[in-house]
Amino acid sequence: MNQAALARLIALLMPVGLLGGALGSQYLGGLHPCEMCYWQRWPHAAAILLAGAAFHLPGRARLLTALAALAIAVSGAIGVFHAGVELGWWEGLTRCTAGGALSLDELMNVPLVRCDQVQWSWLGISMAGWNAILSLGSAAVITGLLARDRA
């Protein structure tokens, strides 16, 4: 496997794993995401689509893989921002609120999750922190592999 193919594979598998972990923690683990958690998911979804397309469009594979790496890095940057909010380094851009429910009964049953509250951590690092580390690290690896393959 050449380095561009490895980069493409990482660009697909890393966001699949991270987004899968987020969805699994929500639907299987009972952790309710805050607004910034959702913000981090969208770039991963875009990266999955871009990297998946790279497997089917070989003439555009390098560009699509690079764009997937950029999307992964964007999720990582949002993760850095979110982790900083959780640690009290800075304030978030918005107040995390529950979604707009149609009735009072629905509103009372929607979990309110604050963006500055850590719901889960491992080794003292929150999910947002792990997303930042893994996303930025994998984006750097993908970019490095693409650069070395070109050289």
Model-predicted regions and their roles:
Residues 2-13, 56-76, 139-146:
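Interfacial segments of alpha-helical transmembrane regions
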Residues 36-46, 118-137:
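Membrane-interface loop-to-helix entry segments
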